[in-house]
Amino acid sequence: MRGCGLPMKMEHQVACGISLWKGFDFNLHFQGAGKSTFSIEGAVAYPFSQGYWGNIMTDVDGNYWSLGKNENPNAKYPRLSFGGNANNYRTSTYWMRDGSYLRLKNLEVGYTLPTKWINRIHLNKIRVYFMGTNLLTFSKFDLWDPEMGSTTGEKYPLSRTFTLGLTLNL
């Protein structure tokens, strides 16, 4: 990603772990970045860049400036063009986007069974838990995940995972 216009990217992380009532525990981890900008490129900024039969992103389709019968003066993107007429796609601050985000990176909720229950089966500890990764992202940028490190959006997003687990201590 190319930065422009802001003096420094601020990265932040917040983590919290709490042992709650009667064997329940809760851990969460937020991660994010502020004061981050980047210039979008690729198929969003240059539709048909792969040739006459090239693709355009869904967000561009029907949301570009046009004249005539289907005029769209309040479009999000400049007019579509192909070939040598690429003046619409010159580098400018128009293509700059806010890359700031806040993500709930990890969430874990667990329950440890009381020792009086597990002593009967000769174990020290039994804990059941649920863990989720990349559950929520808050960002003004909605075309793709701002943490991907891509100016084109042509990468797989981060996986959202869910885990159910059991911890046994002998």
Model-found features: residue ranges?
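Short sequence motifs at beta-strands and strand-loop junctions characteristic
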Residues: 4-9, 94-103, 156-158
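Transmembrane beta-strands of outer-membrane beta-barrel pores
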Residues: 30-36, 106, 113, 132-139, ...
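C-terminal beta-signal and terminal closure region of outer-membrane beta-barrel proteins
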Residues: 62, 66-72, 87-92, 135-170
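Repeated loop/turn-to-beta-strand initiation elements of outer-membrane beta-barrel proteins
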Residues: 23-26, 116-117
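Extracytoplasmic gating/loop element in the C-terminal half of outer-membrane beta-barrel translocons
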Residues: 33-127
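Membrane-embedded beta-strand positions of outer-membrane beta-barrel proteins
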Residues: 16, 28, 128-130, 166
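Transmembrane beta-barrel domains of outer membrane proteins
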Residues: 17-19, 110-114, 167-169
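Hydrophobic, lipid-facing positions within transmembrane beta-strands of outer-membrane proteins
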Residues: 10-16, 104-107, 160-164
